[in-house]
Amino acid sequence: EFARHVEAVTARTLTGEPLAVEKSRKNRWRVSTGGADRIVVSYLVYAREMSVRTNWIEADFAILNGAPTFLTLADGDIARPHDVTLELPTGWSLSLTGLAPQTDRGPHAYRAADFDTLVDSPIVAGNPAVCEFVVDGTPHLLVNLGESGVWHGPQSAQDVEKITREIYRMWGVMPYDRYLFLNMITEAGGGLE
């Protein structure tokens, strides 16, 4: 029921002319495009529920999950690429996700091959602790938010690298170009692979 977190939906043409938007169902909006084949849709998303399926944004960092964040066309055209560009607040330097970087479009621009990839690729932004290791030429990043003495990042990265090497030894292949382990370390516990 992610639509309850979406509000203030607006639309405009590429030249900035406003377009009419109406909420047609609790999880759908209809835009009168005026014949435009490309438009810009903007909206606000509630982001103060920390779980493995929702979003959390605070002064120091953001965790964005795709399903409660991104809208797409209702006609089922989910196989097309989806682009995401983040504008980070002053003082934030990193955005990290499994999405393909599009550095020609900016330091925080990404592309998902399709909507399923988009909603299955969480994004972390801020200044998290990042430890990197390489297995069989494939970079792996261990991204830790909230580490502050509870979790020793470099030692954790060494431990995760050992596990990853064993998995590679067993399967003989790395079925990805890059892998991110995203850890939000809180007193609440929990987790999701």
Model-derived features: positions:
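Catalytic zinc-binding patch centered on the HExxH motif and its immediate surroundings
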Residues: 187-193
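Acidic/histidine-enriched alpha-helical segments
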Residues: 178-186
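Non-catalytic architectural context of zinc metalloproteases
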Residues: 2-177, 189
